[in-house]
Amino acid sequence: SKYRYLLWIKKILRKMSKIRNAITKIHNEWRCYCERKKLKYTDFSIISNNCWGGLIYQKFGLQYTSPTVGLFILDEDYLKFVEQLDFYLAQPLKFIDPRMSKHHDYLYREHNKEITYPVARLGDIEIFFMHYHSKEEAEIKWKYRTMRLNRHRLLIKFSQRQSNTTDVLDRFAAIPLRNKLCFTPLLYESSQCNFVYIEALKQLNIQGGDETPFTLEAVDICEVINNLEEE
């Protein structure tokens, strides 16, 4: 009958979907394996002001060994965070109503709506857990990923997204950590840090969007990781 025929078709389509998903998974795992083979070691950690760090872990198929995954911290707060990294990582997260954020007006203009994801204060800075469903999830993952952090092989990455002056770049360059990488829409040089000019950030900082493809075109991330100095 027509009904049985339709059921048969649906069954075939479900099987095809499972096969396609399995092939995609195998392909992704193989791609990650090939990328990992380019690395000298895989026990590095990335502190990042946005989702970039998490995407690098995903590129290599590695476990997250940093709390700064799936979230963002605005420029000024991020500089405070990395200037006193040990201090802030020892502070408890205190979740707040997003409408009480000191950055509420800025974020409302950016999103054109109220934000609904978890927001927490860490001392006097604020962290926006953009890719988390609840405060509980955000807090649990923040804690155990902080415990995984490898402080001896640490990449401190900063993308200049909200600020547009060299003052923040001066501050970032002065942070007494060995492995610093900064993507900026400004022309800036320093012997204390690897500053990478990304013209696309000028537009991204106005319209929003993912910086990752542009940054990975500008730097060889395998080379960056392979040349990390031990802290």
Regions from the PLM with identified roles:
Residues 33-35, 39-42, 48-154, 158, ...:
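Positively charged, amphipathic N-terminal segments that serve as targeting/anchoring signals
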Residues 1-41:
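Membrane-proximal basic amphipathic "stem/tether" segments
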Residues 6, 12-15, 29, 88, ...:
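Surface-exposed polar/charged interaction patches
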Residues 145-195:
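Extended, basic/helix-rich recognition subdomains
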Residues 186-231:
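Polybasic, proline/glycine-rich intrinsically disordered low-complexity segments
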Residues 8, 18, 77-80, 144, ...:
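Exposed alpha-helical structural elements
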Residues 73-79, 182-187, 208-211:
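Short, surface-exposed, polar/charged, turn-prone segments marking secondary-structure boundaries
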